[in-house]
């Protein structure tokens, strides 16, 4: 299960089909220095690697089932995010938002967060409109894993059967990937997402390999 940015980028290059390669910041030094000053301590090495090697220079929309994941552009990465950490009108800090949370992006407005003071913790999605940020859903054990899994879902939904619907609803109401997309995604999502695979699969009934059949016990 890859957890580093270089390993995630190596695997991304094996399937990324976009017209441009968006994961190559041309000049990250200013962003790194700005973040270091905000944090007041050395940045976690995985975050430094993301900023230097992979943060997109423009907001990057990665399609998922439901709302897409929007990764914020390099110059948008900050501990100060209007509407989340601070009031967008007054600029005053909002209560309840941890000062060490860095927004990597959002899913339909739900923030995807890395805690710069606890880099060993999971990258998690939290939910706006619930009155607090007390609980969220872990998505990945690192920024590299988040990037890889989100890009894999995006590719399965947009890059396997271009020009054709990637999703269908079965007779029983199950949401299914197109067969070719499911065949591509199943082994990769299980291997790359590890314990977070079910969260990435979401409502897709065929995003993961079926469980192995149990052999009947002999009498």
Located regions from the model:
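A surface-exposed partner-binding patch
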Residues: 1-111, 164-166, 171, 176-219
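Residues in well-ordered beta-strands of folded domains
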Residues: 105, 115, 124-126
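Short helix/loop capping segments that flank catalytic or ligand/cofactor-binding pockets
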Residues: 112-115, 134-136
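Compact, glycine/acidic-enriched structural inserts
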Residues: 124-159
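Helix N-cap / beta->alpha transition motif
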Residues: 70-73, 115, 141-142
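Short, flexible loop/turn elements at secondary-structure junctions
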Residues: 105-108, 118, 130
């Amino acid at each position: 299960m890859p957890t580093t940015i270089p390993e995630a980028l190596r695997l991304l290059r094996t399937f990324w089909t976009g017209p441009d390669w968006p994961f190559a910041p041309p000049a990250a030094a200013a962003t790194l220095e700005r973040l270091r000053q905000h944090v007041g301590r050395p940045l976690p090495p995985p975050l430094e690697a993301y900023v230097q090697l992979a943060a997109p220079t423009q907001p990057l929309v990665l399609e998922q089932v439901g709302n897409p994941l929007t990764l914020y552009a390099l110059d948008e990465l900050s501990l100060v995010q209007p509407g989340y950490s601070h009031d967008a009108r007054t600029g005053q800090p909002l209560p309840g938002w941890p000062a060490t949370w860095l927004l990597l992006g959002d899913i339909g407005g739900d923030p995807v967060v890395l805690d710069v003071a606890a880099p060993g913790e999971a990258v998690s999605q939290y939910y706006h409109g619930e009155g607090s940020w007390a609980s969220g859903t872990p998505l990945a054990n690192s920024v590299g894993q988040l990037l890889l899994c989100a890009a894999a879902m995006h590719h399965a939904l947009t890059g396997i059967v271009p020009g054709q619907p990637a999703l269908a609803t079965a007779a029983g109401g199950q949401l299914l990937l197109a067969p070719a997309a499911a065949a591509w995604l199943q082994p990769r999502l299980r291997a790359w997402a590890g314990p977070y695979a079910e969260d990435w699969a979401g409502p897709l009934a065929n995003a993961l390999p079926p469980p192995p059949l149990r052999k009947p016990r002999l009498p």
